[in-house]
Amino acid sequence: MSALDVPMKQIRNTPVVLGEADLLKTIQLLPGVQAGMEGFSGLHVRGGGPDQNLILLDGIPIYNADHLLGVFSIFTPEAMKKVTLFKGSFPARYGGRLSSIIDIRTNDGDMQNYHGTISVGLLTSKLHFEGPIIKNKTSFCLTGRRTYLDLVARPFLPEDKKYNYYFYDINAKVNHKF
């Protein structure tokens, strides 16, 4: 089985376009994976097309994994715990695709302490916060991101028209030990 765990540190430290760490662009740098077009997040694994990949987020299929025609992926690194890429000979439970499986597991949240980060980038801002609800029993993880493309584009658009050129992502998870 050709499974590869993608280290979270590698995702966060990969040189990026527009200052935003991106899971799919990091995967494009791995052997056997090619990008569709420069700067976009389409994946061609071992000759297959982007529609032949299965992307799972905690076991749930994701059919549209990017924003702005592939410039940004929907996955924020702070919300991810583990990423596994299967480039061939994947288990039968992942059936239905020809090229690859990207299995993403989200962060469970810290059972002991509260902590978080706020980051402001060239085109996006992010917030990540996690901690216990009930220590050693229940935790949460909350991550949000918003672009300000609408603010950047405003000076170039007619004054009588308002366009909403932006997107936002919110990932929330509550984890409880029974």
Stretch-by-stretch model annotation:
Residues 53, 79, 112-116, 134-140:
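Outer-envelope beta-barrel architecture signal
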Residues 121-146, 159-178:
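Transmembrane beta-barrel wall of Gram-negative outer-membrane proteins
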Residues 23, 41, 98-100, 114-116, ...:
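Hydrophobic, lipid-facing positions within transmembrane beta-strands of outer-membrane proteins
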Residues 67, 113-115, 156-161:
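Extracellular loop and loop/strand-boundary signature of outer-membrane beta-barrel proteins
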